[in-house]
Amino acid sequence: LVNGSNARNYTFGLENGAEFHQIASDGGFLEQPVALTSVTLTPGERAEIIVDLSGYAEGDTVKLMDGNATVLSLNVTEEADAQTALPQTLNEIPELVTDGAAVQRFTLSGMSFMVNINGSQFDMDRIDVEQHLNETVIWEVRNAQDMMGSMIHPFHIHGVQFQVLSRDGAEPPQNEQGWKDTIAVYPGETVRLAVTFSEKGVFMYHCHILEHEDNGMMGQVSVQ
C-alpha cells in the first residue's frame, strides 16, 4: 500500500473488520508481523500487509476499504495447492544508539500557503542543519498548534531511513518500529527520531503534503 496522494490520509481496513498483518513499512520488513484491523497512511507512507484468506470459500469477495470507499476487491478462487504460514521473525533491526546523542529540533507551523519549519520558509541557497556522516542524532519534530490551527504533517527525510523513538514520550506502535522515512506528526504532538546518514551530501526534509512542501515547509541538511 502506497499513499501517493498530495494531501489525503487513508485508513485501510477489511470490510468485515477482520484482522490482517502488517509485515513491512517504508524501509522494508518489520521484525515480526503486527496484527491490525486498520492502518493509517499519510502522504508518502507505505505498508505491506498480509490478508489470510484461509477462512473464506471459493466465490467469496474480500474488500479493502477506506471508510465507505472500496480500494481493492479480492476475489477468492480455488484452494491453493500449497499451504503457507506467516513467519514469526521477518527481520533483525539493530537499535540505533542514542545515549549522549545531539538533538535537533524542528517545529512545523501553519496551514495552507502560510507554512514554515522553525519560523523559516525554504531557501535553496540556505543550509538549515549540519550533521556528521554516520552520526546518530535525535530529530525532535513538533507539530505546533497556533492561531492558524493545525493538521497532520507527514514529515519526510531524503537520503535516510530512521527509527521512531517516541510519540509524546510514549513508545511508538509496533508497526512504526521498523525503518521509516516518513512519519505522521499529529497536531500538538512531538515525535523523536533516531537519524543516521550513511552518505554525504545535501538532503531535503519536508512535509509530504505537496501544497505545504511547495509553499516552503521544507529545509536542507548537509551531511559531511
Regions found by a protein language model. Give the residues of each.
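Active-site pocket scaffolds in enzymes
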Residues: 21-34, 105-224
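Histidine- and aromatic-rich segments of cupredoxin/plastocyanin-like copper-binding domains
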Residues: 2-100
